[in-house]
UniProtKB/Swiss-Prot annotation:
NCBIfam families: prmA. Keywords: Cytoplasm, Methyltransferase, S-adenosyl-L-methionine, Transferase. It is an enzyme of class 2 (transferase). The gene is prmA. Its main location: cytoplasm. Its EC number is 2.1.1.-. This is Ribosomal protein L11 methyltransferase.
């Protein structure tokens, strides 16, 4: 049986209003999807986890008229709808279809990110087991790719790595699987630290190899390698602190930076690091360098 699917681009603040309205006009299901690939972690009880840019998908039984649904929605919500799209889709195995959307991804020469339900394409490669979802997004965001590709190209043997803003732990876990001696993770979100611990366990990484801290608990480490995939503003503000956490001769990789923000972030680190040319991917950049 075919279904009518209506997709709306919404903000988190609009979620409850539009969810209730869709159910009121007869939707058999309402789901939320990440519109950009932003990590988001397990929510507190009685809260709805949402991304800053979210797609709401409402599913209706076949034969439902899209124009009628949209007209009733505007009446219920009191105004024009946000950007939207409707289409008729054929019935299918929805769980299988969702899983099929996420295939193993290769970063650099050695590293693969592999969903748990999929066989590793190259069993002898470095395979990081990580399922897409709340703790990871799809994994295709350019900032993540830039950092993973950089790590894949480094000699990490016997290195101590610091993942500042570790989120799901993907960068630290990748570093350990690529040969790092130890990785330290820190994040402002306790739930992110829990996600990192869970993902490390899936990859056979012992707790002592990947200690995790809130920022105020972070010891004064001297890292051989520091990675920070956060945002340009915090990277600039934290430049003195982050620079101080890298030993002389140590390496730095920063991302979460839009192309137009690259020069500002680079300038904040230029006095302490010999910087490489800025790497760019799909409007995002990565800044790397070596501590003087």
């Amino acid at each position: 049986m075919p279904w009518l699917q209506v997709r709306l681009a919404i903000s988190p603040e609009q979620a409850e209003t539009y969810e209730d309205a869709f159910l009121e006009v007869g939707a058999v299901s309402v789901t939320f999807m990440d519109a950009e690939d932003q990590p988001i972690f397990e929510p507190e009880l009685n809260t709805t986890p949402l991304w800053s840019h979210t797609h709401l998908l409402a599913l209706f039984e076949g034969g439902t008229e899209a124009a009628s649904v949209l007209a009733h929605m505007e009446l219920l919500t009191g105004g024009p709808l946000p950007e939207h799209h409707s289409e008729v889709i054929e019935d299918q195995d929805w769980e299988r279809s969702w899983m099929d959307n996420f295939q193993p991804m290769r970063f650099g020469q050695r590293l693969w990110i592999v969903p748990s339900w999929h066989a590793a394409p190259e069993p002898e490669a470095v395979n990081l087991l990580l399922d897409p979802g709340l703790a990871f997004g799809t994994g295709t965001h350019p900032t993540t790719a830039l950092c993973l590709e950089w790590l894949d190209g480094q000699d990490l043997k016997d290195c101590n790595v610091l993942d500042f803003g570790c989120g799901s732990g993907i960068l630290a876990i990748a570093a350990l699987l690529l040969g790092a001696k130890q990785a330290v993770g820190t994040d402002i979100d306790v739930q992110a630290l829990e996600a990192s611990r869970d993902n490390a366990g899936r990859n056979g990484i012992a707790d002592e190899l990947f200690p995790l801290y809130l920022p105020e608990q972070l010891p004064q480490v001297q890292a051989d390698v520091l990675v920070a995939n956060i945002l340009a503003g915090p990277l600039v503000a934290l430049a003195p602190q982050l620079s101080g956490l890298v030993k002389s001769g140590g390496r730095l990789a920063l991302s979460g930076i839009l192309a137009e923000q690259g020069e500002e972030v680079a300038a904040a680190y230029a006095q302490d690091f010999d910087l490489d040319p800025i790497a760019t991917l799909d409007g995002w950049v990565r800044i790397t360098g070596r501590r003087r």
